């Protein structure tokens, strides 16, 4: 490796790792302000980098962002700092790993009032694997409830560093930020000077611009990229012309050349963000690099759900909205499907539950769509008796039980960090959700890190909410996918008057099927409105009915006009009413309200 040139030696690429609400975006604002990338008057909003309304409201970062800052150190040297803001949530862990690969250092931000959380640890391990220099930062030190020394001990136990290496700041008040800037200069290594080698650049994000096409954010690892050169993408072997390249302050700043160590953007008339995959390598078309950068993988959706417009005339609008969303979100997968109960809609694949919620909320907010969402489920592998494997992401596609040899479901390894007082509650929740307990590590006298393995299907419903409520908000979780395992799973159908409602079908473990069936029938009885005829709600596994509830008919008192009189006259009127109800039952269809589909989501309440 050649020694760093003066220019490259003055570049620092770093990111910020933090749990939700630990003050990452506020700290980024202070750094932007201190380097005069922005002054206070331009900061019309807190959290400048979180530019989606949803990002601000939920206090999370959904997309990766990059911003370049110029900084003059105390010694009088000018430096270029590239801050890559990463998502912190478990659903986006692949995006995080690619953003980390574009850096040499990471600020580990921990809230002085909360301590180390599960997602902090998960992303910290990703950073250590990527070989980054870690600078621990305790934030919110000015709050009365802060426990700086206690949190410092947790960090020392976690990464084994000296107490004096841990910085203390208050991002909101701006305390300690100047010392943090100097620490970034002193401790984060400069990029390697690989300008003489063939071009290799790592894509860590892409956004869609309606006028320019996909804008690719990349870190130049080796070589030099000039405007007007032809570039090739490794993943799909497509060649594009680099129309515009440059660096990112808060707005794009065009440049003629990007060199090894630089973080910038590339616009080359890419019509679809799916061509610019996160983690892919860009090289020259004429003299390409031999090998791509390590770590690229295709992101596969983990959670599937059906999205249907409430008004079936809006199907095309929903298609357009999903198309526009997928321009900016390459991990959203969708295919059209039809349901007897709900009409035309789409089967969508998401990275996880948060990703699913965000897509739904953006459809409702940004595109004014009214949608019904079916129960989220995972992708099962069904091994048939003839040896072939069928992938099932929708319960209605489950093959006939007589042809199934066995079913496999995805499992995840999960770590839960909580106070020691709540171990019992969490163990109980783990057993309820078919979890396999592995071990517990004590982070300090109060906090523990518990390790479980769960079927993914058991945590996609409301696991996070339940975890928060039984631990009074103190527990945090993080999980990673570990593979498929064989399970005794069955398809539970719901029938209304002997007609199956496909959108209410679910795949559950046999041990839970009876309980689910009973709860679901009871829940639906309270939601489906009364009809003029009796409605039977049944839960069935195959042809076996395991639970039933009956909604009694609304009936008119046909005897009201008979004052006393002959019993045979009354009987005649009652028989006539009975015949009418019978005919109604044959031709009538029970309307299933939207609440019925949501009932499955909160069945335990």
Curated annotation (Swiss-Prot):
Going by the UniProt record, its keywords in alphabetical order are: Cell inner membrane, Cell membrane, GTP-binding, Hydrolase, Membrane, Nucleotide-binding, Protein biosynthesis
Supply the enzyme class, top level: hydrolase
- Give the EC number(s) listed in the UniProt record: 3.6.5.n1
Name the Pfam families for this protein: EFG_C, GTP_EFTU, GTP_EFTU_D2, LepA_C
Q: Which function does this protein serve?
A: Required for accurate and efficient protein synthesis under certain stress conditions. May act as a fidelity factor of the translation reaction, by catalyzing a one-codon backward translocation of tRNAs on improperly translocated ribosomes. Back-translocation proceeds from a post-translocation (POST) complex to a pre-translocation (PRE) complex, thus giving elongation factor G a second chance to translocate the tRNAs correctly. Binds to ribosomes in a GTP-dependent manner.
Protein name, as recorded? Elongation factor 4
Q: What are the recorded Gene Ontology BP terms?
A: positive regulation of translation
Residues bound to GTP are 21-26, 139-142
Report the membrane topology from the UniProt record: Peripheral membrane protein
The protein's matches in Gene3D superfamilies, at most eight in alphabetical order, are given as: 3.30.70.240, Elongation factor 4, C-terminal domain (3.30.70.2570), Elongation Factor G (Translational Gtpase), domain 3 (3.30.70.870), P-loop containing nucleotide triphosphate hydrolases (3.40.50.300), Translation factors (2.40.30.10)
Species this chain originates from:
Chlorobium luteolum (strain DSM 273 / BCRC 81028 / 2530) (Pelodictyon luteolum)
- What family does the Swiss-Prot or TrEMBL record give for this protein? Belongs to the TRAFAC class translation factor GTPase superfamily. Classic translation factor GTPase family. LepA subfamily.
Domain of life of the organism in this record?
A: Bacteria
- Main subcellular location: membrane
What this protein catalyses is: GTP + H2O = GDP + phosphate + H(+)
| Family matches, as SUPFAM superfamilies | EF-G C-terminal domain-like, P-loop containing nucleoside triphosphate hydrolases
Instruction: Supply one GO CC term from the record.
Output: plasma membrane
Instruction: Fetch the CDD domains from UniProt.
Output: EF4_II, EF4_III, LepA, lepA_C
Q: Which InterPro entries match?
A: EF-4, EFG_III/V, EFG_V-like, EFTu-like_2, LepA_C_sf, LepA_CTD, LepA_IV, P-loop_NTPase
Report which residue ranges the record marks as coiled coil: none
- Localization: Cell inner membrane
tr-type G domain span: 9-192
